[in-house]
Regions:
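Vicinal oxygen chelate
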Residues: 2-20, 30-31, 37-90, 98-127, ...
Length: 168
């Protein structure tokens, strides 16, 4: 693709975004993500011993990738290992998803129940065996009730502030 033909003010034509997660045991991670969250396996690539070294999963219309890497991968990058990340999964019924995850994990590992947030979402978070956090998010209202001193700022509001215009 010749990027020189794109102007600097042209919007990129994105077709998607997928997290790429690293696990020390990708085979176990793949099994856990499909069993606990109900993600659908799209494809996996196994090495000669049958261990997963890369896989693609689906969560609704979204995709995520995972890979198995050992300590030598992190040593070559000059870091001690993965630090995990937070992944947000948008759902239509967060309470039903919480029930599913809780049932799959059992009583000893069940996540905290969903909580309403001041920005109109109802969420719960659970960590996977690789140290990644997964927040399941249902937008329940457009009403935002921020704590005192907080404010919601959108790009158009920032532009108006910079030019002295009153947003309307």
């Amino acid at each position: 693709m010749d990027c020189s033909a794109m102007s600097s003010d042209q919007e990129p034509d994105y077709v998607g975004l997928a997290p790429y997660l690293y696990y020390s045991d990708a085979t176990a991670a793949l099994a856990w993500l499909t069993r606990v969250f109900g993600f659908t396996e799209e494809v996996r690539f196994e090495d000669g011993s049958g261990e997963v070294f890369q896989a693609t999963l689906r969560a609704g219309d979204a995709r995520l990738q995972l890979a198995g890497v050992g300590p030598e991968y992190w040593e070559a990058k000059g870091v001690e290992g993965p630090v995990g990340q937070l992944n947000v999964v948008y759902v239509t019924d967060v309470d039903a998803q919480h029930e599913r995850v809780s049932a799959a994990l059992g009583e000893d590992a069940a996540p905290e129940p969903p909580q309403d947030q001041p920005y109109g979402a109802r969420i719960f978070t659970v960590a996977d065996p690789g140290g990644n956090s997964w927040t399941f998010w249902q937008q329940v209202t457009d009403q935002v009730e921020l704590p005192s001193g907080w404010r919601e700022v959108r790009p158009e509001d920032q532009e108006a502030e910079e030019t002295g215009e009153v947003p309307g």
